[in-house]
Regions:
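Flexible helix-coil transition and linker loops at the boundaries of alpha-helical arrays
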Residues: 38-49, 80-93, 124-132, 165-175, ...
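Flexible inter-repeat linkers and adjacent short helices
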Residues: 1-101, 281, 323-326, 331-375
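Long, mid-chain structured domain cores
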Residues: 56-156
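Structural register within alpha-helical repeat arrays
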Residues: 15, 56-58, 101, 141, ...
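Residue register of alpha-helical TPR repeats
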Residues: 10, 51, 96, 136, ...
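Residue at a conserved register position within TPR or TPR-like alpha-solenoid repeats
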Residues: 19, 60, 98, 105, ...
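Helix-turn-helix repeat elements of alpha-solenoid scaffolds
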Residues: 20-36, 64-81, 109-120, 150-163, ...
Length: 375
């Protein structure tokens, strides 16, 4: 059989990547198999092989995103295949390598490592000609800065991603990307305590997700609405949206179901509705075990010690220590405040002061986060 030019295979990989970014699973799977067959008869080209390996890694990330309840293959294997040891990479390939490594580290909660890779990728962003591909990079930067509570940096990047995706919203292919951008925008507004600006974005996201029939995105929209109303102090509305989120998360197999149960348990416990709190706590533990979610297992453990097992201050303090890292600081801040208020209500002021100080410690660590990745 006559060999296939590497440029032809490269163009097919580009098309494959477009389907991956649009979450077109069926088309992406078909192209993946077609390209695999063509690689066997392609003219020798190291860059094309590396490009395929990178897209294969990105394909696995897409599958994990659209099927969060399923265990996927070890993505670290893909990264080891594209380390580039002894290989000279082009500018665009350097961009992809660092960008996808950043995504991988982010998925593990390694935010500082992820930012380091994203920064390397950003230096090669001028090699990326496609506006929507640059928007993907901007979105990922905004996402990680949001999780690190670096609100203004997150807003800087999300604005660029949002406008790029919204400009292409008419064909319906990038509606999900617009929804994702709205989640980040709303989360940043919540962190700025301007909740009235967050709610419209989340309601737009909810409506869009309903129109698309996307239960996973709808579950996230309802969860975020519940969280925003909780931050506003409107517990009844928060409960309303969180309860609605449960069904959508169950139907879509969303791992966010654990977070929804955690939020419901916390709200009921704070309202002194012990039995309801215990009910959702138990569901949360089940869900955390099913999804192997150690992070929310730690959060639920704090609720257990505080509300179900006698509120021993040393045990609660030890449980909060598990959240003493860059991913856990926002939750440490919230749960330390919850603990301080709990002990204030029962008249244990020494313990209350201790947990207030723990909250202040978490706030300081969040503020320090912006300096951790600077040289």
């Amino acid at each position: 059989m006559e060999s296939i030019p590497a440029a032809v295979v490269g163009q097919k990989i580009n098309e494959w990547y477009r389907h991956i970014k649009k979450l077109n699973v069926t088309d992406a799977e078909m192209l993946r198999e077609e390209i695999k067959r063509e690689l066997d008869v392609m003219e020798e080209d190291e860059q094309a092989v590396l490009y395929f390996q990178l897209m294969d890694f990105r394909h696995e990330q897409m599958l994990e995103y659209v099927n969060p309840s399923q265990n996927q293959v070890n993505k670290a294997d893909y990264l080891r295949a594209v380390e580039g040891e002894g290989k000279k990479l082009t500018g665009i390939m350097e961009y992809y390598v660092h960008f996808f490594k950043g995504m991988y580290e982010f998925s593990k909660g390694e935010y500082i490592k992820a930012i380091a890779f994203y920064r390397h990728a950003e230096k090669k962003l001028d090699k990326v000609a496609d506006e929507l591909e640059r928007a993907e990079f901007y979105y990922k930067m905004s996402e990680i800065f949001y999780h690190m509570k670096q609100t203004h940096l997150s807003m800087y990047y999300i604005e660029q991603a949002y406008h790029a995706y919204k400009a292409h919203k008419a064909n319906g292919m990038y509606e999900i990307k617009v929804i994702q951008c709205r989640f980040v925008i709303a989360g940043n507004y919540d962190d700025l305590c301007t909740h009235e600006k967050a709610i419209p974005h989340l309601k737009e996201a909810e409506e869009s997700a309903r129109n698309l029939g996307n239960k996973y995105m709808l579950a996230k929209a309802l969860l975020n609405l519940g969280d925003s109303y909780k931050n506003m102090g409107d517990q009844d509305r928060a409960l309303y949206f969180l309860i609605k989120a449960v069904d959508q998360a169950k139907e879509s197999g969303a791992k966010e179901l654990t977070q929804i149960y955690y939020e419901l348990a916390l709200l009921h416990f704070k309202k002194k509705e012990h039995e309801s709190g215990k009910h959702y706590f138990e569901l949360g533990v089940e869900s955390a075990e099913r999804f192997n979610d150690w992070f929310f297992t730690n959060l639920l453990n704090v609720l257990k010690l505080l509300y179900l097992e006698g509120a021993q201050p040393t045990a609660v303090a030890d449980a909060l220590e598990e959240l003493d890292d860059i991913r856990g600081y926002p939750y440490l801040e919230e749960l330390a405040l919850v603990s301080a208020e709990f002990y204030t209500e029962i008249g244990h002021m020494d313990e209350s002061v201790y947990f207030y100080n723990k909250m202040i410690y978490a706030q300081k660590q969040i503020r320090r986060g912006e300096f951790l990745y600077e040289i």
